[in-house]
Amino acid sequence: MDNFLKLKFRVESLMIVSLPIFMIISRFFLEFFLLIISFSFMVRVIKKNNYTIFKEYFSLFFLSLYVLLLLSFLFSDEKMNIISILLYFRFALYVFAILYFLKNEEHLLNYFLNTLLVLFFILFFDSLIQYIYGYNLIGLKIFETHRVTSFFGDEPILGSYIVKLFPFLLIFKEIINKNFKKTNYLITLAIFFSPIIIFLSGERSSVVLFFLMICYYLFFFIKTKKFKFIYFYVVFIILSTGTFLYNSDVYYDRYITQTMNSMFDKEARGNKFFLPKEYQDKNNFYLLSAQHQNFIYTGLNIFKENKLLGSGPKSFRYVCDNDNYKINEMSCNTHVHNYYLQALIETGLVGFVFIILTYLYIIYRSLKNFIKMLKGKFFSITEVIILGFYFTQLWPLMQTGSIFNNWNSIVLFLPIAFFLFFKEKKMKSINLVKPSKKKNILCF
């Protein structure tokens, strides 16, 4: 029986290790594995009658968020997403389940980070092949001439994937034992490969978020030994990006010409198509594009009728076609492509204040660590790395996915498990111990 339980625990740990893989190839199995892990975690907690793992501020934070979503849903007219909203608590379970396994499986962190490292290399070479030949390793065509998607196929989120998981590479670099020289070199190489993948993806939002993230880390890495290469890294990014834009008409058009036209050229075909003439005359420039400006006007019309608790979570797609809200036939989409605007529309002032306070807390923790650094006091690099992730992902003036999208929610909540894990360790560096060759098939 003990052998069976050990095997079961290892299989469940393997599911956690495979999460970055299933973020790419199967959202169904991504959620399925997380549900199995969470169910197993809850069975263990109930059997042992030990609920101390839930004694975190995150529990209060998530409970507040969950109650807010329920209230917004109950007072809304749209009831299409009742199952999705009721089961939203599962994301908190995912966090605590992963935290539990991190604390109880000695080498899980090592396996997880090594898996991620291998994935970054595979995605880099696959992206190059797709960019050069038009097909990737498994025959998937390039999405557009300027949109390399690798294994994501017709879903252009490769850049978003790299940006969201890039901080884990930095965590790996921070905590890896310095004696693992080969692994250290490979991590550094993957860090340098990352902006190339993001750039080839053609995702302008991901490129901006990556630059913003690097600027954030630049303030904290100036006094750290393991990240002394950060200055050379910034120069490398600027020179390589500039050189590529200069030599590629396709990417210059994507990143420069299209961006300038979508924001400042009222006569651009796309801008005239998305906004009625009376709305075009109101703007000297567009926030991101005329299409997004349309969503803003439509969203604000919805908000005016649902100020306190909004129109309900995930409701924009259902209410945007209402004649009282839309400004033309192009006013509808599945979401409004901005977390803050989505919070304001779908959860009202209460939800908007909630996300604002969350972001202010991130800034507060960041400033606290920065002051510690200036005074020469100890501060947690791993905490700073994760704060940098949320500082950029919740940056207000960006085009985003839906905050309630399952894939997006998983990726947004995942770092919290690691944040709580490192917080409990109360140390700057966790030297990964290399397991025996029989057990570790991933360590280099």
Residue ranges: model-predicted function:
Residues 125, 200-201, 221-283, 297-305, ...:
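A membrane-periplasm/extracellular boundary helix in multi-pass inner-membrane enzymes
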Residues 36-42, 171, 214-215, 358, ...:
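Transmembrane alpha-helices of multi-pass inner-membrane enzymes
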Residues 20-37, 52-54, 67-91, 102-111, ...:
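Interfacial transmembrane-helix termini
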Residues 1-83, 100-110, 114-117, 172-185, ...:
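Transmembrane signal-anchor hairpin modules in multi-pass inner-membrane enzymes, especially those
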Residues 15, 25-47, 85-97, 157-167, ...:
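Membrane-embedded alpha-helical segments of multi-pass membrane proteins
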Residues 11-19, 57-66, 186-192, 334, ...:
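Loop-to-helix entry and N-terminal half of a specific, functionally important transmembrane alpha helix
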Residues 142, 280-347:
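Long extracytoplasmic/lumenal interhelical loops at the membrane interface
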Residues 17-20, 93, 110-143, 150-226, ...:
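Alpha-helical transmembrane segments of multi-pass inner-membrane proteins
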